[in-house]
């Protein structure tokens, strides 16, 4: 295993989804789309708040109409059996976030109309003197369904209470354009990503959107076209299809003002700097990108799962193993936020207990279809020739086993699992520090910041009893402040901030085009705040009833459609059915 190992770019593999999708768009069709959107851009930028609210309502109702069919096709494409708990994944990673985001955007637009401000919670401070803004729970139903969960944004240095208010919802208060066309290059793994990116660009930033579907899940495009049909009819949105060639044509198109991509850093660099070779190197040295347009991006991560040593009971460690398993197993581990590196304390008995619990949970989950192009190739390159590899589950044709790689040396400079996103069902562990919580946190933060690739997200597990010690409590808060990740989940599933939609989702700020890491810019952010450094979700160490997103929940496929329906208007009448299924999970 050496530094010379390079994993191929995702787009270099042919996509062959199990569900039929529309054919690639021709250049004339793409030209027609961009021309139409160019005509609609100024109109959209000048819409009144009332007109935007009407459009949001139409888009949300449209998405509710297609949700079930969208989930069914997603399950078919990924080899998931309908009517089983695994079906819940497609509800959780598809309609839930989209319907919720549209509700929260509507609430923000109504608040802007009525008060001139978007809704936020209490403003506080962080241990390093920055402002923090509470965003979740946003209402009593949030608080009841996710008891003692909180989400806040930590602002960048220099953001003041005055600038926090002045810069909020900037497009609506201080418009910086009179109509722009943005190209959104959709992700191929998670159904919600493309529509949620579209919603962000349209309603946070006031831009019209050309959405190019990813070939891996292009079968979802017709559902997005149907759901967001009103935006398409008014020339505010167009959906096109194709692979790298079509994407390249649109990226440099004269009618595209800017680009947003969810994908890999390799794809980003090909767009910004051109194909690998001497010419790219020269451009990078001269800081002369091939792409002259603004680009924002979310580009993946080697996601750490950090466990602070403490007085955990067996059931408490088991609950956190469920969190880790959910992050690792969901969507067959084809997620940018999937747990990939267990960063555990040296010389602490709980490290082995956690790994055993995690492996026991994974062993009961049948291996999933490796639907993402290149998965088997990546898996073989990362696992072949290693000594401490454990495969779990009976592998069927087309699937890959849940794979654990143990005992990685944290000081190994050429370990590919530290420096490259695997994007396949591989998880590894490494040990740092000691059983002393403060020493461990210092070492773990240093390792994650300076050894692991990426700046998107991190999990931090800490026992509440430890926080009663002022010294340890301070060390935990300093660790949260120092971790250079855009999203941090404390004692919670890392995918929750994504689907909650109110927090920002994106890389830690400060990347450069030459070293993009996990990307630049943020999406979601339904309160439309500026100057965000990171989103922080905190949860209890254990929760009851069992969260519906846990891989072991027995009725999640019954509960998730009800949760999606509730998110339409956040009505109490729709809560009892959710609670009933949650309690029986």
Task: Please describe what each predicted stretch is.
Residues 2-167, 213-218, 227-232, 576, ...:
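N-terminal Rossmann-like NAD(P)+-binding subdomain of aldehyde/semialdehyde dehydrogenases
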Residues 47, 54, 66, 81, ...:
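Catalytic cores of nucleotide-enabled group-transfer and carboxylate-activating enzymes in metabolic
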Residues 54, 441-550:
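C-terminal core of ALDH-fold dehydrogenases
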Residues 148-192, 196, 205:
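Active-site-adjacent "gating/activation" loops or surface patches in catalytic cores
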Residues 181, 193-245:
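PLP-dependent aminotransferase-like
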Residues 181, 215, 230-341, 346, ...:
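Conserved NAD(P)+-binding/catalytic subdomain of aldehyde/semialdehyde dehydrogenases
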Residues 205-216, 291-310, 324, 328-356, ...:
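Short loop-to-beta-strand entry elements in the cores of soluble alpha/beta enzymes
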Residues 330, 346-456, 470-471:
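NAD(P)-dependent aldehyde/semialdehyde dehydrogenase
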């Amino acid at each position: 295993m050496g530094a010379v190992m390079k994993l191929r770019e995702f787009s270099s593999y042919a996509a062959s989804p199990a569900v039929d999708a529309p054919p690639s768009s021709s250049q004339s069709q793409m030209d027609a789309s961009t021309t139409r959107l160019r005509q609609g851009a100024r109109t959209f930028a000048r819409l009144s708040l009332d007109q935007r609210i009407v459009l949001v309502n139409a888009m949300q109702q449209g998405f509710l109409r297609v949700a079930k069919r969208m989930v069914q096709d997603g399950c078919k494409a990924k080899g998931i059996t309908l009517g089983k708990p695994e079906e819940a994944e497609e509800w959780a990673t598809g309609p839930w976030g989209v319907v919720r985001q549209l509700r929260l955007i509507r609430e923000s637009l109504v608040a802007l109309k009525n008060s001139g401000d978007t809704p936020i919670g209490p403003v506080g401070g962080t241990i390093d003197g920055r402002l923090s803004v509470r965003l979740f729970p946003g209402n009593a139903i949030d608080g009841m369904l996710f008891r003692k969960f909180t989400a806040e944004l930590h602002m960048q240095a220099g953001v003041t209470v005055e600038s926090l208010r002045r810069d909020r919802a900037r497009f609506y208060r201080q418009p910086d354009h009179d109509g722009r066309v943005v190209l959104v290059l959709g992700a191929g793994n998670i159904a919600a990503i493309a529509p949620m990116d579209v919603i962000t660009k349209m309603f946070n930033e006031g831009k019209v959107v050309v959405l190019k579907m990813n070939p891996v899940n292009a079968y979802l495009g017709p559902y997005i076209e149907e759901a967001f049909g009103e935006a398409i009819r008014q020339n505010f949105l167009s959906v096109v299809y194709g692979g790298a060639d079509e994407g390249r044509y649109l990226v440099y198109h004269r009618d595209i003002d800017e680009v947003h991509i969810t994908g890999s850093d390799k794809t980003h660099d090909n767009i910004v700097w051109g194909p690998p070779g001497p010419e790219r190197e020269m451009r990078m040295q001269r800081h002369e990108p091939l792409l002259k347009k603004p680009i924002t991006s979310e580009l993946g991560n080697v996601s750490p799962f950090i466990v602070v040593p403490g007085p955990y009971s067996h059931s408490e460690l088991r609950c956190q193993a469920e969190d880790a398993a959910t992050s690792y197993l969901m969507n067959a581990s084809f997620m940018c936020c999937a747990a990939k590196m267990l960063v555990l304390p040296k010389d602490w008995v709980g490290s082995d207990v956690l790994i055993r619990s995690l492996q026991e949970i994974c062993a009961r989950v049948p291996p999933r279809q490796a639907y993402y192009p290149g998965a088997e190739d990546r898996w073989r390159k990362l696992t072949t020739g290693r000594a401490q590899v454990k495969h779990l589950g009976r592998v069927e044709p087309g699937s890959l086993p849940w794979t654990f790689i143990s005992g990685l040396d944290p000081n190994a400079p050429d370990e590919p699992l530290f420096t490259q996103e695997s994007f396949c069902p591989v998880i590894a562990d490494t040990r740092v520090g000691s059983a002393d919580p403060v020493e461990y946190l210092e070492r773990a933060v240093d390792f994650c910041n300076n050894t692991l690739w990426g700046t998107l997200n991190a999990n931090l597990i800490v026992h509440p009893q430890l926080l009663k010690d002022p010294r340890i409590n301070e060390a935990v808060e300093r660790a949260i402040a120092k971790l250079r990740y855009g999203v941090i989940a404390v004692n919670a599933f890392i995918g929750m901030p994504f689907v909650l939609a109110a927090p920002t989702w994106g890389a830690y700020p400060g990347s450069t085009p030459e070293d993009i890491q996990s990307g630049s810019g943020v999406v979601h952010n339904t309160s439309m705040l500026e100057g965000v450094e990171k989103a922080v979700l905190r949860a209890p160490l254990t929760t009851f009833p069992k969260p519906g997103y846990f891989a072991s929940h027995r009725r999640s496929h019954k509960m998730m459609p009800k949760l999606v329906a509730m998110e339409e208007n956040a009505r109490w009448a729709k809560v009892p059915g959710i609670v009933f299924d949650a309690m029986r999970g």
